[in-house]
């Protein structure tokens, strides 16, 4: 399963971490994902959603 938000499609970013001596190493920054039980097309489904979509109210959570 991918580390990607199923609502907005936000996924990992890649880049370089640069130390004080300017050595560079590849790294990945992962989105803040949560597994949420939500209504999708009238059915209850567990999906991965980023915090930004949760706070914006783009997901109808099931209790």
Swiss-Prot record:
Cite the GO molecular-function annotations of the record. structural constituent of ribosome
Concerning SUPFAM superfamilies, the annotation shows: L28p-like
A Pfam family cross-referenced in the UniProt record is: Ribosomal_L28
Superkingdom, according to UniProt? Bacteria
- Family note: Belongs to the bacterial ribosomal protein bL28 family.
The record's HAMAP family line, in alphabetical order, gives: Ribosomal_bL28
List the protein's name.
Large ribosomal subunit protein bL28
Q: Where does this protein come from, organism-wise?
A: Dictyoglomus turgidum (strain DSM 6724 / Z-1310)
